[in-house]
Structure formats: C-alpha cells, structure tokens
Amino acid sequence: MYRRLCSRVSCEIAIWNDRILSLAYANGLNGYGEGVQLYELSPDGAVLSEAPIPEERLQTIGLDCGQCMVAYNDRTRGREWLTCFSPGGGALVSIEGLEGYPGVIPRGSSEFYLLGQHLFSYNSQTLQHEDLGLAPWDLPLYRGACGGLHFLTEAWQTRLLALRDLGGRGLEEVWRLDFAERDQHVGWHGRVEPGQVNFLNLYGDDAWISTHVRTYRVDIRTGQIRAVRARFLPEFLVEGGIGYSLCPGEFRAMDMARGVLLREGPRLSFPLGGEALRCGFKDLLVRDGLLYVSVSLWSSGLYLLAAFDTQAERFVWHDAWGGCSLDSVHIVGDRLIACDGDEVRIYARE
C-alpha cells in the first residue's frame, strides 16, 4: 500500500502550503546543545535547503505559522524573546514580552494570536505584531475553534472557555464551564482529584466534553449543557460528518451531527506474525476512509504506524518503527509523511 522512500533524522515536521519543513539535531538525538538544523524537504525526501538555527540561549523551538519559532532566554540579563526564522533559516523578526514559547491561535490566512504571558497579534507575511496586554488566563491551552469561537482550557484543564475574536484586537470571553468540583474523582494514588477536560470534540454547534466522570453535550453558542452521559467519548477524527477513533483500544464511529454512536466494537488486538498482540492506539489522521494510528505493542515496547480501514474494520497496512510513539502523520499528494520525534519517514502510495 505504501513504499518507504526515505528516512531522515528529525525531531519535528510541519507541512505549510505543501512545503515540508523539518527540524533535526546534529547528533540525531532529541536534545539541545549539539546543533539544530532547519530543513526543507522535497516530496521524495531530498534536501531543498538547510540552515543552522542559533542555539545560544535557546529554550524552546518549534514549527508554527509556516516558520521556525525559537524562544530564547538570557537568564543573566533577565530577558526573554521569540525569534521567527524563514524556511531558509533567515531571521525575520524578534518579539519580546511573550515570556516563553507561545501557544498559536490561527485567525485565518497569515494572521495569528500568540499566547504567552501576554497576548500578541502576529501577521506571518508582513511580520507586524502588537502586544495586546497581559493574558488573563491561568495556564491556558488552546483546544481549537468552531462556530466562530476559540476554545481554551485553563487552570490545569479544569475549566473550558469559549472566546470571541475581536477582529485582531484580542479575545473576549463568551462563556466558561468549571469542572474542578462537579467532576471530582479518585486518582491513581487514592487522592481526590479535581475534574478536568480530558477529551474535547467540537462539531457544528456542539461541544462534547469528556472528563474522568462523564461526557457533556454543550451548546457552543451559549455554553448551556444539553445532555449528560455517564461515559466518556474519545477525541474523534472527523471525515464526512463521521468521527472515528481507535483510542484507547476499541473502534468507535459516531454521527457527529446527531450525536449517535454508530459503532462501538470490542477491544482490538494487532495481528502480527500470526498472533493477536495486545496493544494501545493513538489516533493521528483520517483520510479517504483510512484511520492512521500509532500502535504500541505492549509485549515488546515497540511502535508501529498502521492504517485501519474504517469500513472493513481491519488493518490494511503497517510499518515498524522504534521505541517512541508517533507524533504526527501528513498526506501531501500521494506521499505519506510521518514523524516520531526522532525520525521522519516519507512513503509513496502504490
């Protein structure tokens, strides 16, 4: 089904307008201090460009907004800043006041919010940016957008916030739900833990919020709770209005508009070498009826990249990886591109 074309050292990949960007460390390990390189790769894995990223005082690095973003920290002077580099490695702009690597909130096209200690507006084409003031949220984590609203969790994911974009001038709270007390539960160590947003599905005018205790169906526009179910729903990958998931171990399919589970199968094993192996799954991508997952084989500690046919309900392809769970899968044309934080592989569809 897929033929491997190449394998390269990589700690992160990103696809931006069909351009393949990759970060790698000189010694092949996922750690700083050995030289960081930014690559642009062709669909066949050839290096189109290569540039070193300045490492002195580097704190965090990532690929966002079609650029390489690097948070630097000069602790001796008490100064932190973010520098954005082009795919070719040229320094484009430096931004002070974020205090660390920001969360990135897309606004459309080349416009973004950068969320750190302060909230910034940022245009990745013009490089214009503006400090919009201190971010009022406690440990915010961006969870996505739906129905014209942006969603954050805060306070160790105990609260969900719906925010309205004020035309690039900031984000205004529309509603919030607090699960800390209402969904308390006994944790792994026998202690009472606050309720948290574990899984969030945004579709149409529904937000499906799963905690350790139950699942809430919430009206995205108002925050009103429409229904409560005494079970959890995983985060689905949606195609054609149907959400699919193998996580944590059963195949589920859900009509997202109606909120109806169409399929909830028994716990799956992975067929390999004539055996049915116990395993866990991490959903990565759904495309053309195939659900791509990272498979953890519990008996060996190894990981696979596998494709699951959602109609036939069986695995149709896999490739063995190493000892790390895969982070991401992308499809560009007839190329499948996957990364596990140490390595990127490019496959051609046959």
Predicted regions and their residues:
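Short beta-strand elements that form the blades of beta-propeller/WD-repeat-like
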Residues: 18-32, 66-76, 109-115, 120, ...
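Intrinsically disordered, low-complexity segments enriched in Gly and acidic/Ser/Thr residues
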Residues: 229-230, 246-322
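Repeated scaffold domains used in trafficking and secretory/extracellular systems
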Residues: 6-18, 52-66, 97-110, 134-149, ...
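Structural motif
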Residues: 28-39, 77-83, 117-123, 156-163, ...
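A short beta-strand motif characteristic of beta-propeller blades
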Residues: 1-6, 46-52, 89-96, 128-134, ...
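An edge-strand/N-cap motif at the start of beta-rich repeat modules
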Residues: 1-46
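Short loop/turn segments that connect beta-strands within beta-propeller blades
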Residues: 42-44, 86-89, 123-127, 165-169, ...
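Solenoidal tandem-repeat scaffolds enriched in leucines and small polar residues
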Residues: 106-216
